């Protein structure tokens, strides 16, 4: 009784014709095979790219490693190694090849000309030395070294001249070490270093003992001493003035002090130069209020330190690891992908039991070098490294060390030598600055509490201040003034 009679269903083929599928696959197997091949090729390409980048990074690391001889005469002491022995051994096969490649690299035409001239000057210098004309010989040795600073023969002969004629065994040992770094099989440099290494190590240890004695003498002065308080205040200004000056800041000491005391701008100076000084002030206050009392220094502490250093100059990059590759003169720091691992290793070393056994000056200088070598930030690496160094020294009872901006070229030269394998000249440079800073404090708290020589910047100011001073020790005063004004000279 239905209103519509049931109709028979049409054949399946007819349904397909009437309602064709939107996308009908004729044969799914070739499409799957094509996708599989495409994924395989893409994966292989990605793996090859990763391997190439890793190999490039490995080459960088290998070229930064110190030589790994087993002989005592070529090694610096274990605490001076940037990488662990395990890391060095893991890379040794590749490292030996990279060293042989670099040693066998051909010289450019200009380098060949310089080497030829250097060797000629070297022969003339040796002849003059044998003839007893030491002054002329010294000048020719220096000329040869300037022309070919990494030629083993030049380093060896100049080192012998310094050792036997100038009685400068420390510098001679440094040149023997450099000669062996470039040419490990040099038998003459080897014999010379066997003779000098232990003597130089003994001299370095005696120097550190002397620094400890001066530190103890300074520690014996009560905190309530008025001269000590004034010395600390002026040293604070000096530290900031010289640290930003090393990086190119053109503020004078008087302008630096004015900014810190009044927070007023100085006419004719850029905003960045003002902000660099204010950032250092923030970082120093953070150290005094927090870091000096901490047992361990962490990555977070270093980032907080850097955040304050760049807080006014570049607040976005402050306290952040860099995200790009940077180049620092001839030094190529690690890529951004390696920073997290390298900083973790640095943190472990910084707080290790082994590091706690190092002399504070060695420890602080090494920490400075290791951090600036990693170069974890876009900007502010030098300032942050110097602040970390002084944090470690202050925890050991030393005052913050002042590296005069006039010695900027020496400072960078010794960092370059450390990159080439010998960190001892840099450690000695920091020890020298430490001693001069200690001498300044001891001098300021002895017979002239009313005047701190670090304040003086110009010859006219120096003459005016000297006229006001009544102490009989004029030679000592002049020596201190010379160091802090010219960046050279030795304190008595």
Curated annotation (Swiss-Prot):
Its membrane topology: Single-pass membrane protein
Biased composition (Low complexity): 1-18
Parts of the chain that traverse the membrane: 33-55
GO cellular component: plasma membrane
Activity control mechanisms: The side chain of Glu-247 determines which of the two opposing activities (AMPylase or de-AMPylase) will take place. In response to endoplasmic reticulum stress, mediates de-AMPylase activity. Adenylyltransferase activity is inhibited by the inhibitory helix present at the N-terminus: Glu-247 binds ATP and competes with ATP-binding at Arg-386, thereby preventing adenylyltransferase activity. In unstressed cells, disengagement of Glu-247 promotes adenylyltransferase activity.
Knockout-associated phenotype: No visible phenotype. Flies are viable.
GO BP of this protein: detection of light stimulus involved in visual perception; histamine transport; protein adenylylation; protein deadenylylation; response to endoplasmic reticulum stress; visual behavior
Chief location category: membrane
Annotated region (Disordered), positions in chain: 1-26
EC numbers for this chain: 2.7.7.108, 3.1.4.-
SUPFAM superfamilies reported in the protein's UniProt record: Fic-like (SSF140931), TPR-like (SSF48452)
Pfam families xrefs: Fic (PF02661)
Inhibitory (S/T)XXXE(G/N) motif (motif): residue ranges: 243-248
Site (Important for autoinhibition of adenylyltransferase activity): 247
Induction notes from the record: Up-regulated in response to endoplasmic reticulum stress.
Active site: 375
Entry's localization field: Membrane
Ranges where the Fido domain occurs: 297-432
GO molecular function: AMPylase activity; ATP binding; Hsp70 protein binding; protein adenylylhydrolase activity; protein homodimerization activity; protein-folding chaperone binding
TPR repeats: 118-151, 152-186
Family listed: Belongs to the fic family.
Entry remark concerning the domains of this protein: The fido domain mediates the adenylyltransferase activity.
Subunit (UniProt): Homodimer; homodimerization may regulate adenylyltransferase and phosphodiesterase activities.
Role played: Protein that can both mediate the addition of adenosine 5'-monophosphate (AMP) to specific residues of target proteins (AMPylation), and the removal of the same modification from target proteins (de-AMPylation), depending on the context. The side chain of Glu-247 determines which of the two opposing activities (AMPylase or de-AMPylase) will take place. Acts as a key regulator of the unfolded protein response (UPR) by mediating AMPylation or de-AMPylation of Hsc70-3/BiP.
Protein name as annotated: Protein adenylyltransferase Fic
Organism (species): Drosophila melanogaster
Classification lineage: Eukaryota, Metazoa, Ecdysozoa, Arthropoda, Hexapoda
